[in-house]
Amino acid sequence: MALTRQELELIRRGLGREPTAAELAFFTSHWSEHCSYKSTRRWLRELPGSAPWVVRGRGTDAPLVEVAPGLYVSFKIESHNHPSAVDPYNGAATGVGGIIRDILTVGATPVALLVNLHFGPPEDPHARWIFSNVVKGISDYGNRVGVPVVGGETWFDEDFTYTPIVLATCVGVVEAEAVPRGGVAPGDYLVVAGLGADRSGLGGSAFASKTLEGGEDLGAVQVADPLMGKKLIDVVREAGRCVKFIKDLGGGGLATALAELSSWFSLGIEFHLDKLHVRDRAAAPEELLISETQERLIFVVSPQDLPCLEAALRRYEVPYSIPGRFVEGGRVWVMWRGERVVDIPISLADGAPEVLWPQEPYQPPELPQLPEPPLEKALDLVLSSPNVAKKESIYMRFDFDVGVKTAVKPGEGDAAVLKLYQRGQLGLVVKGDANPRYTFLDPRLGAANAFVKAYRNVAVVGGVPLAAVDSINVGSPERPRVYWQFVQAVQGLREAAAELEVPIVGGKVSLYNEYMGRPVKPTVAVVVLGRIDDVSKANRAMWREGDRIFVWGVTRGEVGGSEYLKRVHGVVAGRPPAVDYGAERKIVDVVQSWLGRLTGATDVGVGGLAAALAKMAVNSGVGATVDVCRAPSDVGRLDFLLFSESNGRFVAAGEEGPGVAVGEAHGDVFEVRCGGTLLYKRRVEELRRLMLL
């Protein structure tokens, strides 16, 4: 996207002259929406991000959260929507590679990946093409680099047919003493390591800062190299303690990396582009500055520690060059064959002006009068929905056991559980959630719902939530309704984080998610990280023969934005479920008090109580007889009781359990009753086939 007239004038005034071609490329890339957050950062500053256990929050490539004395976890989320729309295989693969490198910047070893994927209807040929190639790209990269994909969330909606939302989260672990030590000083070297620069991904950040109109240039999409990605992991593991700082070379290329490094350390940089190792010797300096060639890191290292880093790079056969160093002063200098092609003050380089767009609120469509449908047919429709169905066809393509750290695997529970071998039975619990329908109807309440859903998933498995990262994906901010959606979503996240006392330590905003003038439904994904003291006590979403079944929490008549409303009545209307933060916090305490004494548990969410019970039966391979009318509720309609998506609820199973007993697990038939009336009956195997994507 071209610089605006006002931005060009600001650059001319800041430089005191006309910018060079290389400087124009520098600013076009680094001042793009994708890199500068110029339309969003004013609002993002409002998000709460601090807590005693947060070692490093927002503002650098990756945060750090202390989960045990001297043991840190880093996790971060990234979007790769535009590239995945044009080249879904490489778009998804490079999204995974990029988020892994972000985690490497704090010296952490990547231990897990999660993905939040939003596609068009699976029966649509184009959506199916994107879906298949995105999943293959994630699978191929994750499997080859040796980082397991342990969970995520998948959503299908017409809005994402041509504009998918592809989000990747990486979790890494690092001992406190292994974090790069900082203390950057003049004379320290900038070592660029990884693939040689070429023209791949040229202008990728500018490409991600405009809407899709069809016929986009594939050259803006980067190409992944998981073998080199794995080598960089090995180098960081071996030489991370030798260096002072690590920076990912991602969006914006060298332009953004140099601007951020200079700004973070308040030092000048002298960088010789002609000393950079390249694969395309015909590339012009302005192209090398903004190239987004993948699998590259910048290591900041002192002259005396350079041999330690070089030894590791040579051992793993990673190409590298030493084209830059920190210098006194406040300018970024880039040299090319003896000529200074970039000479920019730090304050200007990292000083993209903020933009505030007009906002236009709207009200969601009112919930219409709904006829009560035949319940057996309604149950089949909801349970077979792609948004409720089990996603075995996706996660079975991932090697989720590589590294043997996955204690609760995809499909087994509400969240992934990872064992931390550094600390006995201590583990991490992590889950990401989003509901674009909710955030379309009410962006503020929808964002809060995404937060509490991920929080509750972590809690029900047995984790104590510690921190969160978020990803907000909307259309063009130049549309007043879209900009209002974004601002409202931030307010919802701020409220949820503050009320739940879970800091937001990082995030990503992706704008211009449109195709041919049509914005996607605003999509707010929240990934919550928690800790569990004993992974062997984690709750899976299943029961055993003879278990009693319990429901905790009250079902209210909240079907606005529900899967039932869309699937059975073809309507998207009403308000999303209300959020009771006290009830959500209570779930943490209740589950902790029962930890190790339950067979299993699952939260109640999309598809309502009916979907939660059916999931438990299918996961277990054991049927049940359940009287849903025993569940605590204030509704008078059976369809609302079955399909309401009220928050603050979960299902548990065991000899005893929290909440109200509603049935018993036994046999191979799943029966739903209301008192003496049979509402639904399916053999578990039949139910399993019905619920497969």
UniProtKB/Swiss-Prot annotation:
It is an enzyme of class 6 (ligase). GO terms for cellular component: cytoplasm. GO terms for biological process: 'de novo' IMP biosynthetic process. GO terms for molecular function: ATP binding; magnesium ion binding; phosphoribosylformylglycinamidine synthase activity. Pathway: Purine metabolism; IMP biosynthesis via de novo pathway; 5-amino-1-(5-phospho-D-ribosyl)imidazole from N(2)-formyl-N(1)-(5-phospho-D-ribosyl)glycinamide: step 1/2. The active site is at H34, H80. Monomer. Part of the FGAM synthase complex composed of 1 PurL, 1 PurQ and 2 PurS subunits. Belongs to the FGAMS family. This is Phosphoribosylformylglycinamidine synthase subunit PurL. The lineage of its organism: Archaea, Thermoproteota, Thermoprotei, Thermoproteales, Thermoproteaceae. The gene is purL.
